[in-house]
Every structure is written in structure tokens, then in C-alpha cells.
Amino acid sequence: MPTFLFLGSGEFEPWSTEVETIALAGAVGDGSVAILPTASAAEGDHVFERWGQMGLAHYRDDGVPAAVVPIKTPGDARRDEFIAAVEAASMVYFSGGKPSRLAGVLRDSPLLVAIHRALDRGAVYAGCSAGAMVASRVRDAGGRRGTSWLFGLGLVPHVSFGVHWDRAARIPGAQWWMTSRLPDDTWFVGIDEKTAILGDGVRWSVHGRGRVTLRGPGEDATYRAGERFETPSP
């Protein structure tokens, strides 16, 4: 089974060390983390490099080997040396930024194929903010605009993920708009800031400071750190 680690915000901060340690303990690979700040590339090289350095410092403090894989464009996602680095790692970590940018780089790329191969052999896909959102189900073919995330790549094919979910609650109508337009057979998981979920796509555990909101077929519930929930395939 694949392993996913999704964070609502707060990548490369001390609060996430515990759940990352749990995830890496069961991961298959060379023991390293491949850091991909791809979603921030549109904001300029200085932002991309800052996120990369934050990741390196975080894992250095935790005693975990890590390297930045500098994928910024669709062309980069076809480079053999970058694909090899992703395939070898125990954890492939996409930090935050613009989900549309990240999805555009990954969609139909050899890198995405490599990520699936890594998951199949036991690596962890970790994503914070945009990195979590692109794991959502693929938009239905021919569906009207807004019925599912346009940037979902289907890593978890029956779930859509929202991030910064507690912040979204402070924007009138934002949560309703995002959840009311999802297909009826889709689970929705809203992850608060500085909160994470770890699981295999069906069974999840909650970690961090906030809550996780689950909505789906016959379900409307919230969960906190130490609790578990499921998102079974329809």
C-alpha cells in the first residue's frame, strides 16, 4: 500500500518532526528525503531556494539525509538525473506554493510516473499545502468548472484535500464553496494549519495542533491528534 503524509501548513517546522519520523520508519528507499519546492517556482528563484534551504536545515537538525531536487518546469520533470533522485528516496516531499503550477509541471510527466513507482515500492509521498492538494482526485472528464480540483492528479483517486482549513473558515463562504461543488461520491478532507494526516489513502491518523474535517457519503466529522478516520473507496 502507498503511504501519504499531508500537511495543512507549516512544512519544515519542528512540530512535524514526530509524524515525519513515523512515516520514514516504515519507508522503503535509501533513507533520504527528496525536497521539491516546485510549487513555489513561479515566485522566483529566491523563494524556491529559500524553501529548499529550510528543508535542508530541518532534516539536518533531525539527522535525516536530504537533498533538493531542483524541478521548476515541465522540462525539468523529464530530466533523468532528477527522476533517479526521486525514485531512490524514501520520502518525496513537495512543499507549498501554487497548486496549479505544481500540477502543470507534474501532469503527464516521467516524474509523475516515477512517483507512482516509488509509492508502489514503499516510499512516502509528502505534501504540504499545494503538495497535498495536487494529490486530490482528478477532475471528472467534461465536468463543469469547479466540480473538482482542476489540479488534482489522482494520487488518492477518491479524495479531495483542502489545506489551511481553519484559515478558510475565516473567509465568508469559502469552505461552503469548496465542499458544495465536489462530486457526491468524493470524500473531502480539510486539514488545518500545522496539522497533518498520515495514511495509505483509506486509513489515516491525525497529528499536529489543529483539526481535520471529514465530509463524504454519510459523514460529517472532525478529528484531532491521536484520532483515526477512514476514506474507503466508493
Regions found by a protein language model. Name each.
Residues S40-R101:
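Portal/gating segments that form or line small-molecule/metal binding sites
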Residues V19-I22, E81, A114:
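A short acidic, amphipathic alpha-helical/loop segment
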Residues F6, A67-V69, Y93-F94, Y125-C128, ...:
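General beta-strand structural signal in soluble alpha/beta enzymes
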Residues S95, R101-I171:
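Class I SAM-dependent methyltransferase SAM-binding "motif I" and its flanking Rossmann-like core
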Residues V33, V92, S129, F161, ...:
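A residue-level signal for conserved active-site and pocket-lining positions in enzyme catalytic cores
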Residues G31-S32, P65:
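Residues at the starts of beta-strands that form the adenosine-phosphate
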Residues M1-D30, A39-Q53, H58-R60, R139-A141, ...:
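C-terminal and late-domain segments of enzyme folds
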